[in-house]
Amino acid sequence: MSKEQGTKRPAKKATLVVLVRHGHTPTTGRILPGRAKGLHLSPTGESQAKKVAGFLGDIKGITTVYSSPMERTIETAKPIADSVGVKVRRNRGLIEADFGTWTGRKLSDLRKLADWKQVQNNPSGFRFPSGESFLEIQSRMSKTMTEIAEEPRGEIVVAVSHADTIKTVIATALGTPLDLFQRINISPCSVSPILFGSSSPYVLAVNSTGADIASLLPKSM
């Protein structure tokens, strides 16, 4: 074995990505808004955004706050960015799922469709009519997480996105089959920190809405 072959490569520094779902909106739990423009946070959502910004503001070392380009995510990301002294960076990879012709429909109506059972029980084989498939959503989010974690390594970053997109990231990180990802719950303004290192991702918490978020993080960060 040559000296070059025997030399160990230094381990990559881990990047902590703190995933945050946007706050409550007037359509939360009632309508599938998708990528429809003009949806803003409700007063409840604004309060949630300020609250999570206060929690994350206690974390030392956050260098970047990314956001999906949707209004509701930007309005959630802005207080967080202000609390740590940075600007919001829009990242289209974090955008809401494209629900196609289901966009804007009432959830109560969608639950009556035969396709709804597949969305809940076999999402890996489902594509929203004229929209994305769940496999495409998962692939897009995995690519986005890789890009964020590499730019640069060893930092703490916040990524504000949406329920289903965040759920696919958590499922991938845990090695959970996509057909089981609906068992994951992501509440408005909940926090799910994931450590991306040189080996497998390490999920520190899922759907956390408590004040002691900083205690979940590795002491070395």
Model-derived features: positions:
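Active-site signature of alpha/beta-hydrolase-fold catalytic machinery across serine-
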Residues: 79, 168-172
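Active-site-proximal alpha-helix that buttresses catalytic centers in soluble enzyme cores
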Residues: 3, 20-90
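Short, hydrophobic/glycine-enriched beta-strand segments
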Residues: 16-22, 159
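Generic structural signal for well-ordered alpha-helical scaffold segments
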Residues: 50-57, 138, 142-150, 170
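Short beta-strand scaffold positions
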Residues: 67-68, 139, 160-161
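Acidic, low-complexity terminal tails and accessory targeting/binding regions
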Residues: 1-16, 61, 90, 97-108, ...
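Short active-site segment of divalent metal-dependent hydrolases/proteases
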Residues: 25, 165-166
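Phosphate-handling substructures
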Residues: 40, 82-142, 195, 202-207, ...
